[in-house]
């Protein structure tokens, strides 16, 4: 099974080797037939502490690294 890859914006880089990425998704509400936006925050591993708040990044699933971290940064999104 391939690993999932998500794209989002770094909203926090305060943790050691950890960033928080906000991922936004849109979907059509089944009853209202209106496009709805939802966001979710993911803790991701950043080995080199290279990413700063506001960066667009891609994160990929990985084996659990801590209680909250199950994602790691792959690249900076264009």
From Swiss-Prot:
| Gene Ontology biological process | translation
Cysteine pairs bridged by disulfides in the record: none
Sorted alphabetically, which Pfam families does this protein's record hold? Ribosomal_S17
Record key words, sorted? Ribonucleoprotein, Ribosomal protein, RNA-binding, rRNA-binding
InterPro entries noted in UniProt = NA-bd_OB-fold, Ribosomal_uS17, Ribosomal_uS17_bact/chlr
Q: Does the keyword Disulfide bond apply?
A: no
Supply one GO CC term from the record. cytosolic small ribosomal subunit
- What molecular function terms (GO) are annotated for this protein? rRNA binding; structural constituent of ribosome
State how it assembles.
Part of the 30S ribosomal subunit.
Family according to the record: Belongs to the universal ribosomal protein uS17 family.
What does this gene product do? One of the primary rRNA binding proteins, it binds specifically to the 5'-end of 16S ribosomal RNA.
* HAMAP family the UniProt entry points to: Ribosomal_uS17_B
Protein's name in the database: Small ribosomal subunit protein uS17
Organism of origin is: Maricaulis maris (strain MCS10) (Caulobacter maris)
Where is the organism placed in the taxonomic lineage, from the top?
Bacteria, Pseudomonadati, Pseudomonadota, Alphaproteobacteria, Maricaulales
